[in-house]
A protein has these predicted regions:
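Conserved long alpha-helical elements within nucleotide-processing catalytic cores of c-di-GMP signaling
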Residues: 49-53, 62, 142, 164
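The catalytic core of metal-dependent phosphodiesterases that act on cyclic dinucleotides
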Residues: 105-180
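Conserved ATPase "switch" residues in P-loop NTPase domains
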Residues: 9, 80, 145
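Signal-transducing alpha-helical linker
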Residues: 4, 10-13, 56, 60-65, ...
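Active-site core of bacterial EAL-family cyclic-dinucleotide phosphodiesterase domains
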Residues: 1-54, 92, 153
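Catalytic core of bacterial c-di-GMP phosphodiesterases, primarily the EAL and HD-GYP domains
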Residues: 17, 24-33, 60-137
Length: 180
């Protein structure tokens, strides 16, 4: 599966679907979440539950995550240039991506190359991504927020689940897991 994933990344078999985020009061679409899917030429759509853990274990999540971020930013910028109202695009981050030494610069470069205003990008991470990294995580998240984007904790309640601890981090949104 790992060699197939490497080939899939090289040959463009991954696709991004956009799940709309709707204001329940007005019914207006306010944003979307970028969701990566693998369209294998033999198996068809491969479940993220099958390939994301392997991507994490092998480190392939870093180039895959960069591709998703670049693709989602380019698409959101394209929608704006086509006259659509500005939408916030949310992109999930892996802990491995966040640990890359040049990650903040990479995000800034992608925003610059795609022309997407940082205010239209929301990066989502899980609480386990930042827990235990303390001041290092605070500094990195602060640097990301300084770019002008927003940050969200996704699936809160599935891990450490300490609101007191989370107050230390520059987070804009907390998405509570349904099991919390």
């Amino acid at each position: 599966l790992e060699s197939r994933m490497r080939r899939a990344l090289a040959q463009g078999e991954f696709v991004v679907y956009y799940q709309p985020q709707v204001d329940i009061v007005t019914g207006a679409v306010t944003g979307c979440e970028a969701l990566v899917r693998w369209n294998d030429p033999v198996k068809g759509l491969v479940s993220p539950a099958e390939f994301i853990p392997l991507a994490e274990d092998t480190g392939l999540i870093v180039p895959l995550g960069e591709w998703v971020l670049r693709t989602a930013c380019a698409q959101a910028s394209s929608w704006s240039q086509a006259g659509q109202p500005p939408l916030t695009v949310s992109v999930n981050l892996s802990g491995r991506q966040l640990q890359q030494p040049r990650f903040v610069q990479q995000v800034a470069d992608i925003l610059g190359r795609t022309g997407l205003p940082a205010s239209q990008l929301k990066l989502e991470l899980t609480e386990s991504t930042i827990m235990g990294r303390g001041e290092e995580a605070v500094a990195q998240l602060t640097d990301l927020r300084a770019l002008g984007l927003s940050l969200a904790i996704d699936d809160f309640g599935t891990g450490y689940s300490s609101l007191a601890y989370l107050k230390r981090f520059p987070i804009d949104e907390l998405k509570i897991d349904q099991g919390f």
